[in-house]
Amino acid sequence: MSTMTPLERTVAALTFKKPDRVPVILYFQSGVQHDVQELDYTWEEVLNHPRKLFQVVELQHTKYGADNFFLPVDFRVEGEALGSKLDYMLKCGGGMRMGVVSDWAVKTPSDVKKICIPDPTKAGRMPVILDVIRKLKKKYPDVPIAGFVNGPPDTVADVLEGRYKRLYVEMAKKSSFIHDLLELCTQTSIAFAKAMIEAGAGAIATVEGGMVDEAVSPDQYAEFVVPYHRKIRDAIGALGVPYIYHQCENATPFMDLIVDGIQPALVAFHDSVDLKWAKEKYGKKIAIAGNVSVSKSDAVLMFGTPEEVMAAAKKCIEIGMPGSGYWLSAGCEIHHGVPPENIKALVKAAALYGVYK
Amino acid sequence: MSEKLFKEINDAVVVGDIDEAGRLARQGLADNIDPMTITEKGLIPAMAIVSEKYDKKEYYLPQMLLSSEAFYEAFNILKAKLKVETTGRGKVLIGVVEGDVHDIGKNLVKIVLEANGFVCVDMGRDVPIEDYLEKVAEVHPDFLMLSTLMTPTMLSMKRTLEGLVEEGLRDKVKVGVGGGPISWDFCKKIGADFYGDNEKDALKWVESIVGKK
């Protein structure tokens, strides 16, 4: 029996108070594609039209029962606002085409100086996101909205020709313009985050997608990742808004840097992390979320039945819920390979197994 | 004299000094040293050192990719002077599957295979299934190597295998798969021949098929 609104539930869990049940907080990304198709839209339409995007995002709560709204539902907003161009050409099933960067804003180091921090009320698709957040806030004041900003290195990969490969090589060369570019991307995310908060977002969520354990060392993480996320965290923290951090792949080698250096309000764990280890080691110091498998070849959310999803979610809940400070979540984004009934199974599991006495 | 150059070019690749690696390759040619010998004694051992450092976590992707750039700077200069050998130790068709644009892992496999005498036909990333099928029919590779980093695009890998069967090409090529979400289980499920966790696994596999030099 629900006795709290999604907002009350989510905040209670985040702040280690006792919620009525474990909240289900999801990073919806290409997983909304099922609904985009049902509404007979293309990705290009839905990402560029506020009314269409609103219709799709609204379903995250009304259809699937998540305790939050999550948007943008793609990763390219900052890159596009900084001047990169998208083409809708990446096939992702059902004849749908996602946007990918086809022309990068930064080709040479000197290009960095030519780019200004974009105005979120005007640049690229940022105004679309802000408009949808305002509408969601007005219609669903009791459902928290997580505004998503790209991790600064991920935005660099969207604006720098050569993508991550070039970023990695320039890091190894110790090219100073990479820090200039990271700073520009950080300030862009801060401006966007502040605008989303003003529009009604109650939290800012982020992902570090390319700086993963198999790619970079803890020292590189400390230099190229931590200080930039910390700036975003501090800027929104000054407004009283929590920073929700997801590290793709195995966060284990970086956890101390994340918890002590970035100091987010919550870390959402990827499939690769042992949730029990995370809860025991960090669960009193920081709120955690996770991590029903969604991104490995045996991922239950993608390939399992709803019953199997519920069983996996039950295991996570049993680890996470004692002492509060826990959101039930998928191990990564909800992508288009996840069947809708499996998303609903997560919510059903929280209602069945996640009730606090 | 040659030994000194091999050592210097080796060092240049290991530390990722692109300009120096290129300069030494040109100097080697100017000194009339056989380009294949420079490759075998200078470049290939260098990438072995880099790979070892990566395994020991002394190097991570940034250093490894920088060394790869230095390798290619020298290798491309030398390759232009090598006697044309169309198949090397074996021909490998390699690419990232349709729907995925992450190609760093694929590139690392390619460099190690090329450094060890395999000829790679690089299909790039986000490659339509039909393009793989056409290319397999056209160039008759010994191996097809498919990569994906993302879970949703694992389906493209499966469909590429299905396409090979439908077109009657499956028994003409050995298929290896790899990438973040891929596993042996998945490899078996889709009917591929081999799964590798990294570039060394890939090299071991193709060498086990063609026989070591």
What name fits each language-model region?
Chain A
Residues 56-87:
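Glycine-rich, N-terminal phosphate-binding loop and its surrounding beta-alpha-beta segment
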